[in-house]
């Protein structure tokens, strides 16, 4: 970003931490060009990785929030709630008494969910990675630290969207959904609290080091 300007023109750089938005850090760069001060603002999403396969949450919400955001049909919303455990399983002997895995749904129900994801793929991937509005993230910064070694990579968010969103929409062998390189799963954990029933999207941001 600063590389867009000559070092001599940059007066100062400020970084502001943003909470509850896709942008984690907003960088303000003040430059002087032909005696005029210009402020350039860039929004960064920061991902910290501590292992080689650093799967990282990029979004999690209650299903009802995604219904409001994406206009998910009622029937698909009910299926997603069974997937996360907000609604009880409707089959005999589910693998987990708390919820249903994607491959435990009927063929027609699987198709309903997959069709919704396919028809709305661009919007979904854009929203969970970039976000909307003035605080939409424009860059993805990945910082990986393993033992004493550290490295970082900075990519335009549109590059990250194309990379992680590229690929088929499928049901995984673990019974979750996958949109390209994005895993869609029940959040789980949280010591059994209700928040374990949220829908979660995850990526491996370390992939950006190799593309």
Where are the regions that the model predicts?
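Short, positively charged
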Residues: 1-23, 27-211
């Amino acid at each position: 970003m600063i590389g867009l300007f000559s070092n001599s023109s940059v007066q100062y750089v400020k970084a502001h931490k943003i909470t509850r938005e896709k942008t984690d850090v907003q960088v303000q760069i003040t430059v002087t060009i032909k005696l005029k001060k210009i402020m350039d603002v860039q929004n960064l999403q920061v991902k910290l990785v501590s292992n080689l396969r650093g799967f990282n949450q990029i979004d999690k919400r209650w299903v009802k929030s995604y219904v409001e955001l994406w206009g998910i049909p009622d029937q698909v919303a009910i299926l997603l709630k069974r997937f996360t455990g907000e609604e009880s399983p409707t089959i005999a002997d589910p693998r987990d008494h708390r919820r249903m895995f994607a491959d435990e749904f009927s063929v027609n129900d699987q198709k309903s969910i997959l069709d919704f994801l396919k028809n709305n793929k661009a919007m979904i991937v854009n929203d969970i990675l970039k976000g909307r509005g003035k605080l939409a993230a424009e860059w993805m910064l990945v910082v990986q630290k393993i033992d004493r070694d550290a490295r970082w990579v900075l990519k335009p968010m549109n590059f990250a969207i194309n990379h992680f969103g590229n690929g088929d929409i499928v049901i995984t062998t673990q019974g979750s959904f996958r949109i390209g390189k994005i895993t869609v799963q029940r959040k789980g954990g949280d010591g059994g609290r209700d928040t374990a029933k949220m829908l979660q999207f995850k990526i491996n941001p370390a992939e950006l080091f190799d593309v």
